[in-house]
Regions:
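Membrane-water interface segments at the C-terminal ends of transmembrane alpha-helices
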Residues: 1-7, 19-132, 158-181, 187
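Glycine/proline-centered hinge or cleavage motifs at structural transition points of membrane proteins
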Residues: 145-146, 159
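Short amphipathic alpha-helical coupling elements at transmembrane boundaries
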Residues: 12-19, 63-66, 136-144, 155
């Protein structure tokens, strides 16, 4: 399929593809999955980034959380789907141990869980940088004016991290949309 025919831009080759209901449904499902993974991955990444950058944790725990969070980036995306299949598949280790026989891990939810676990480290890295760059004096000023920790988060930290949240969402969304192997393995 090409958009350039005889030197001119045309969408004529795209129309038969979009006329097929099955192809349109695949596009819609991919966008829905990518939005869900982007949203969930950004939330989880923000929680981990906030814990590492803003909470008073021991250095070893901060290092451990950061290292474990980045592990999914080391392996290809399909390895997490294979690992989750071994754990949560029909004869999976966890389902067998829990005695759950009718649990179906394949389909949308299995793909969603696998991609979220695979791609949330991207949001973690993006948001860790954003949260580290927020000037602590702004939060200290809010505390000195009598704001509670929740109000400081709500009125200072969160608004300043919104551009990073948008960036993290777009990165996780695009990675999920581009992933072919995970839906192939877990799509059902």
């Amino acid at each position: 399929m090409t958009f350039i025919v005889d030197g001119h831009l045309t969408f004529d080759n795209l129309l038969p593809f979009l006329a097929n209901w099955y192809d349109r449904r695949a596009i819609v499902n991919s966008i829905i999955l990518a939005c869900a993974v982007g949203f969930a991955g950004t939330i989880i990444g923000f929680i981990f980034a906030f814990a590492v950058t803003r909470l008073s944790l021991p250095k070893w725990l901060t290092f451990f959380i950061s290292a474990v969070t980045l592990l999914p980036l080391i392996s290809p995306p399909f390895t997490s789907s294979i690992a989750l299949t071994l754990c949560l598949g029909p004869n999976g280790i966890i389902l067998t141990a829990l005695g759950l026989e009718n649990f179906n891990f394949f389909g949308f939810w299995g793909t969603f869980i696998s991609e979220t676990l695979t791609y949330f480290p991207i949001a973690f890295m993006t948001l860790s940088t954003i949260l580290m760059r927020i000037d602590p004096n702004l939060e200290d000023a809010a505390y000195s004016l009598g704001a509670s920790p929740f109000n400081v988060f709500k009125s200072v930290t969160f608004p300043l991290s919104v551009p990073g949240l948008a960036n993290a969402f777009l990165l996780v969304f695009s990675c999920s949309l581009a992933d072919f192997a995970t839906p192939l393995v877990l799509g059902g």
